[in-house]
């Protein structure tokens, strides 16, 4: 047998050198085309377009070998003639950086700081050799376990539980931290589960065995109150269960854990921990339950209200199952707006509909001049948040009669406030970005100075950076948000390395860290349910829906008319901004003659009644009017103002599904999750949605819906044409996709699954914080310094609102 020889793996530069020698002319021709366009950033889809414009024979040579691998996996090219630098992503979370001198055909490998420095030269006022602040969080995480298998990404707490269990629990004495964790569980000064009689692990095991023996002798349904006194005498108090059966299950779970600490048993036991005071931060925008129609009051408000009801339901169930008679409290903390404009936003405390113990607590923004009365865009809240945090802290203590157990941040402003509050109170923090604006607005980091007057991204990106690194765990709705896919960069992954020229460079913000956990939400199934459930249908809304869609009248609620109501409908409903790309969908439709022959287009977005206060929405409305005129859309197109009645919106989806021919489209340039995608699928309406972000994961292409590429409008329009032509020829095709969507939702996207998982994550995280160095004190000191020396100045530089 021939001897096996180990060979060295060649670096990317070495492999490229070989390809450059073999295909010199073809590579020079391509790179010359790219630098011929002048300095700038060339995105992945633009690079691919340049390659596709080359004759096929030449293209095949280019794409074979190392250079082809680089082109396919390059996410951007920085063009500064004669140099082209490439950020290459061979797989999720792995990045390499090179630059090529097109004239000399020299290839150099770059470290992250070198690549970012080169990129900064695109911008006037580059560093010119001056010292630049570089942020690197990697040294703080060097000894911390990191997931390497893709299946562990997004299951961070589960991964951490496995790792730390193996490290910490090796004998009976090492179980003492678990005993201590149980002993600190109390409610209003009263112990839960254990009293002071139990002082060590041996005593705990002895007591649990005695309890187990007794419980096996009585009826499973025996209420806890019947044996409460007997348990108190041996050191056990309320919190184990409401019946003998429930108590026995918990006690046996703990006995198994003490005997042989297995991670899944530990997670199951800790998952039953009780968290009684939960605070959910959402400072910006109008946050109310009725009549909120501003650009910042979209999916996040709906998400939080549904989240709160699901969490309360799960918390009450757990409290009952554990035999406790205590009251949980959930507070949604947001702005109080004296100028409430017909809403309840000026009311300090408001009970959440359908809940017993959840309230909206409103605290105003204030300055030295007094309370800020008017609504402020989410991009302009930064100078108010530090004072706001102090005021919120006082209100929480007053309202809860103590500290919260868990603080959940939402969006950038809610996450920075949650970080400050969690730091102040020393409690568990969870963050949820919903959307990271750096991902939504390409090149908003490198060209931040151009955008800062309008968007103040320097403050926002810095707040995001602080919150991500301070929080105990991060929840995302999809894997895509964390690490993307083979072809798409993850929302968080894009924050690993970036630069804000003149401010700082981030050379290693965060890795694919165990703090990331996928916890997908669902739609409110009392509102969004399948069109086939006839007995639940809200037919009383049908006359109003009929008028919205088909009335020949144009007014302040709807513009343009549908002349042929027998055609199926492409339906879309979203905020009217550039990222949601509603005008992009309208343009695709306007340009495709066959699509216009087959179907009508109905758009629900923006406010036709009054002028928007949001600059981006104003620009999109102007663009929409231009498209209607350019493509003569009246007769095939209907533009309806944003609809705030969620209950009627659910019936609107079902009404369109009744035709067994329509569909819902989500054409966003980027969608962090895609709640409207889940809502439409839950109603049984086939859904086409962007392949950029969460919908790429929610939808299984061709089975439960279809992906569309917002950067290739012609292809997206053709995909729609193909679907409608196939459905016209075979109506069962529509039914098959509708059913596939419903099955996908019930498997993965419900609020019941969400609330169970979130509370389990909280329990496991709190335990490991208590018994290990999970709070990462060293990095928090680094963050404190960065907050005080950099973020505070940026936030103070944002102009205060003019009232």
From Swiss-Prot:
SUPFAM superfamilies: UDP-Glycosyltransferase/glycogen phosphorylase (SSF53756). The keyword Glycosyltransferase applies. InterPro entries: Glyco_trans_1, Sucrose_synth_GT-B1, Sucrose_synthase_pln/cyn, SUS_EPBD, SUS_N. One of its GO terms (molecular function) is sucrose synthase activity. The keyword Glycosyltransferase applies. Residues 274-750 are annotated as: GT-B glycosyltransferase. Keywords: Glycosyltransferase, Transferase. It holds the Pfam family SUS_N. It catalyses: an NDP-alpha-D-glucose + D-fructose = a ribonucleoside 5'-diphosphate + sucrose + H(+). It comes from the Eukaryota. PANTHER family: PTHR45839, SUCROSE SYNTHASE 1 (PTHR45839:SF7). NCBIfam families: sucr_synth (TIGR02470). Sucrose-cleaving enzyme that provides UDP-glucose and fructose for various metabolic pathways. This is Sucrose synthase. It comes from Alnus glutinosa. The lineage of its organism: Eukaryota, Viridiplantae, Streptophyta, Embryophyta, Tracheophyta. The gene is SUS1.
